[in-house]
Amino acid sequence: GHLNSLDTVLEIGAGSGNLTEKLARKAGKVIAIEVDPELASSLNKFDNVEVITGDAMKQDFPHFNKVISNLPYSISSPVTFKLLGNKFDMGILMYQHEFAKRMVAMPGSKDYGRLSIAVQYRANVEIMEIVPRLAFSAPPQVDSAIVRLVPRMAPYKVNDVDFFMKFITAAFSQRRKKLKNAILNNAA
């Protein structure tokens, strides 16, 4: 995934700008979203960086064709689905390793569930690299993983995507109960 001057890269949770700086050198434009106003103001030092100060979940994302982010883990799931509601070519995203394993899980594996189905319905997804917690200067409590996400046409047609997502949520939330009950309780 090489960047060039034609790329507009979205970065969510830009923080102090370590990644932003690297992206700004290679991409035509970087859109950096950062919730902390102090950190956000320090991102203005690059000519080709548009800074959006605020909560990524409350912002409309401007047009971008790539997203490269060290996502805040607390919003991994909602931000991923918000991203997948936009048109873009490719994402390189850092997640908690456990979350990443669920994203890429195959049917029948213990990590397979609603997240796997919902993400894989909208994108090809693969873990590129595991990042051990000790690789960070202030180590988090968990290992991380770098995931490549490539949106594509859905592999099968669902007439009502909202219902489909509710349905798989119901099915997986009550995995141990009989599926029939789960469906009756949640689909009505």
Segments from the language model and where they lie:
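Catalytic cores of RNA-modifying enzymes
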Residues: 1-166
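Arg/Lys-rich, often Gly-containing low-complexity segments of ribosomal proteins
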Residues: 176
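Short, intrinsically disordered, charge-balanced linker/junction segments flanking boundaries
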Residues: 185-188
